[in-house]
Swiss-Prot record:
Protein name, per record: Retaining alpha-galactosidase
Entry note: cofactor: Binds 1 Ca(2+) ion per subunit.
pH-related activity note: Optimum pH is 8.0 with p-nitrophenyl alpha-galactoside as substrate.
Family under the similarity heading: Belongs to the glycosyl hydrolase 97 family.
Active site: residue positions: 415 (nucleophile), 470 (proton donor/acceptor)
Length: 662
């Protein structure tokens, strides 16, 4: 009997193996591999240098007709390709990027495909619909299964009720990171992307997505009793009502029983697992940009990245003037004068220039003569950017864009979307296209992480989806912004530019910070704020403080004003997630190097071998000897430097340094 049972088991195992098909795809350097298994379900795994870091993880898509792409799938064909090309990357961390991968397409009966790509620093896949009949996507499974109880650094959704995921889908995508074992992650809270899992031995896995057009964004949740992160998507809105912040949002009151509508052949978003063996390689990955759809714009000549003098963070505070400051023409003329004197490209009119609670951007408050401000700014070679709440912009988008473009406005900062369901991600692309039509740049605030849109529409220069410096207006000292700063280059910035809004001139050493809405400060040192203009990527980059504070600090201000916001080349020289990072960036023949640390004092050695074979002159801003007590303390010094030089810099707790080499 035992012999018969054994034989039957052998036969069943043989039949099961015969029913399964497996395909292996390796990165160009051979270090990363994924094995895709087609059987009762569709799974893939990832190995790095022969070690499995992602165990077979299921992927599928359930349609409203009952079809499940990924269950008992019938393969109809395969194709492979290898690509090694340079692509243009305007208004980014480098002027061009290498797109180097091996690809595998699996074609299935019933008009659907799955495409896999293996890069040297990650594995990505996406579903593709080839059919012409419309349908609804009920659910998509994009789970991540790990071989052990690894440590993850995740941003939880802050809004909504515990366990009520539908209430959590309305959120601002802003939070610090929680680091814990997979088994100890909060199962009542959604996690938004990107997030990082530490696979040990230096290997980290950053999960994100790209080409997120007209499809809901991906969230993950912790699974009970498994080393697994499970996928979640916001359902399609069934009923929305105007409300939220100053009546500028559309609140979802009822949901459909599906997540997306599909009415034609299309590509679905790329699911990306960035996999690197060093933290500095993680911070340097370009996969989110590379996997965005190519540019749909032919003329980019009018797009002008740059810095912007910002009003809201400093609460329109000026001193030494003979008028009452606030949302009025005299205040904005002072901001324009400051921008012009320092070569700052833009001034933004943040919330307050349009009549409150009307959600109508054609109604301007009586204290503002917008045409006069636009003309005054133009006479001083400064562009005007207008803030707009989501609903006010969306409801009359073309008229708003046409009217203000004709007036001479240069772009919009659109805020308070706070959703990433299919309706909202479709809006992002429509807004980008409409702004491009009228030659307007776009900053998407109050939105999710970048996911390839800035490649498809390069006029979209920045995205929020980051727990930026605005949080220091109200956050308690228990919020460790300094720690967060040395996490985001390895997590949030993996997905693209960040509207972090640095540049504070009031700088608090540890223990001295307190929230102040009208006269806010940063955590950490002055030189940290300077360094953030190099370490963080923001093609449209705010100067958050008041012109009055900048004019009291001319040396720091002049240095900030000359730092480019887009680059020809970027190199992450060194770094460890959560501790420190040092980044070098080149524009033309000039290099900038920025470094920041956590609350630990640190001695950094900068290897200058990235320089060319000639002599250079360096200007260094470094923490002063008393920066551990007074965050504003710094020292500026100049000296010659060569390619074979090594520069040693001491960073105070919460400190940083910024270096210009030319």
């Amino acid at each position: 009997m035992k012999k018969l049972t054994f034989l039957l088991l052998c036969v069943l195992c043989t039949l099961s193996l015969q029913a399964q098909k497996q395909f292996t795809l390796a990165s160009p350097d051979g270090n990363l591999k994924t094995t895709i298994t087609i059987g009762d379900r569709l799974t893939y795994d990832i190995t790095c240098n022969g070690r499995q870091i992602l165990t077979p993880s299921p992927i599928s898509m359930t349609l409203d007709n009952g079809t499940v792409w990924g269950e008992n799938a019938k393969l109809s064909g395969t194709s492979r390709k290898s690509v090694d090309e340079m692509i243009p990357s305007p208004f980014y961390r480098a002027s061009e990027l290498r797109n180097h991968y091996n690809g595998l397409t699996l074609r299935f009966k019933k008009d659907w495909n799955v495409e896999f790509r293996a890069y040297n620093d990650g594995i990505a896949y996406r579903f593709v619909n080839q059919g012409k009949k419309p349908f609804r996507v009920v659910t998509e499974v994009s789970d991540y299964c790990f071989p052990s109880d690894m440590t993850a650094s995740v941003p939880y959704v802050k809004s909504g009720k515990d366990g009520d995921y539908n209430s959590q889908f309305f959120n601002s995508f802003e939070n610090t990171y929680t680091t814990d074992k997979l088994s100890k992650l909060n199962k009542q809270r959604l996690m938004f992307l990107p997030l990082v899992v530490d696979a040990g031995d230096g290997v980290k896995v950053c999960i994100t997505e790209s080409d997120l057009e007209n499809y809901p964004g991906l969230y993950l949740s912790a699974s009970e009793g498994a080393n697994r992160l499970s996928s979640m998507h916001a359902p399609y809105p069934k009923r929305t009502v105007q409300g939220g912040h100053n009546q500028l949002q559309m609140l979802v009151k009822e949901h459909e029983d599906y997540i997306a509508k599909v009415d034609k052949p299309r590509n679905f978003p790329w699911r990306i697992a960035v996999v690197t063996t060093t933290d500095k390689d993680l911070a340097a990955t370009n996969l989110s940009y590379l996997l965005g759809a190519p540019s749909r714009m032919s003329d980019l000549s009018w797009i002008k990245p740059g810095k912007v003098a910002w009003d809201w963070w400093n609460d329109w505070n000026l001193d030494g003037v003979d008028f009452v400051t606030g949302v009025n023409n005299p205040t904005y003329k002072a901001y324009i004068d400051f921008a012009s004197a320092n070569g700052i490209e833009y001034v933004i009119l943040d919330e307050g220039w349009a009549v409150n609670l009307q959600a109508d951007l054609m109604q301007v408050v009586k204290e503002i003569d917008l045409k006069e401000l636009v003309d005054y700014a133009a006479s001083k070679n400064v562009g005007i950017i207008l803030w707009a709440g989501y609903h006010a912009f969306e409801r009359d988008m073309e008229n708003v864009c046409r009217h203000y473009a004709e007036m001479g406005v240069k772009g919009f900062k659109v805020d308070f979307m706070d959703r990433d369901d299919q309706e909202m991600t479709a809006f992002n692309y429509r807004a980008a296209e409409m702004c491009a039509k009228y030659k307007l740049i776009l900053d998407l605030h109050g939105t999710h992480k970048p996911a390839g849109l800035n490649r498809t529409y390069p006029n979209v220069l920045n995205f929020e989806g980051v727990n930026g410096l605005e949080q220091m207006k109200w956050s308690s000292p228990s919020v460790d912004q300094v720690k967060y700063d040395v996490m985001i280059p390895f997590i949030r910035q993996v997905s693209g530019p960040m509207d972090y809004t640095q540049g504070a001139m009031r700088n608090a050493s540890k223990g001295n910070y307190y929230p102040c809405y009208s006269e806010p400060m940063s955590q950490g040192t002055r030189c940290r704020q300077l360094a953030l203009y190099v370490v963080f990527e923001s093609p449209f980059n705010m100067l958050c403080d008041t012109p009055s504070n900048y004019m009291r600090e001319p040396e720091s201000t002049a240095f900030i004003a000359e730092i480019p916001t887009v680059w020809d080349e970027s190199i992450v020289l060194d770094g460890k997630m959560g501790e420190y990072i040092v980044t070098a960036r080149r524009k033309g023949d000039v290099w900038y190097v920025g470094g920041i640390t956590d609350w630990s004092a640190r001695d950094i050695e900068v290897d200058c071998s990235f320089l060319g074979d000639k002599s250079y002159h360096a200007t260094l801003f470094k923490d002063g000897v008393n920066a551990h007590r007074a965050g504003r303390d710094y020292k500026c010094e100049s000296f010659p430097i060569k390619k074979d030089g090594k520069l040693k810099v001491h960073l105070a707790p919460g400190g940083g340094f910024a270096l210009k080499i030319k």
